[in-house]
Amino acid sequence: YCNGGANVDTQIACAIAHANEYLNLFKNDLIILEKIIQKTEFTFGIGTSYFLEIAKLRSFRSLWSTIITQYISIENIETKIHAINSNLYYSNKDMYNNLLRATTSGMSAVLGGCHSLSLLPFNSNSLGNEEFGQRISKNIQLLFQEESYLNQVKDTSKGSYYVENLISIINKFKNLSFDP
């Protein structure tokens, strides 16, 4: 939804509504429903709004937990999220600025709690030398993991006033109920 230009509220609402449809199909078979919930993985496009993207993933996780509890009572279900940076924000004229865009969007995805991350090469919108761009994208991910240890802390942005405030704004539609 991100590459289509959807805002954060729309991305979250569409993902939850789409997944809720699948849960509705199997609501009468709790064994299958539990397996589906445990194996579900969501993919989100990540834009360039650093704090908003962190809040988006954290907000989605809490809203999805609310939806799950309407179907079955499972505790500690881990919401698996795959994040991929959006090339919607990549520049064709100055592709080296895309390095910064990829790094900040990737870092916001990791701080938001994604389980896996794909970074598009900074030169994916231009022709030539894709191998170099792929290598740099891989190195950025290795920097997150091996140099900054972002994978060692479970919720690095928890307690941040600004991020928590953004989450409360995004969660304004939390009281909406999806019928199981």
Q: What are the residue ranges of the model-derived segments?
A:
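Helix-rich catalytic cores of soluble enzyme domains
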Residues: 1-109, 120-141
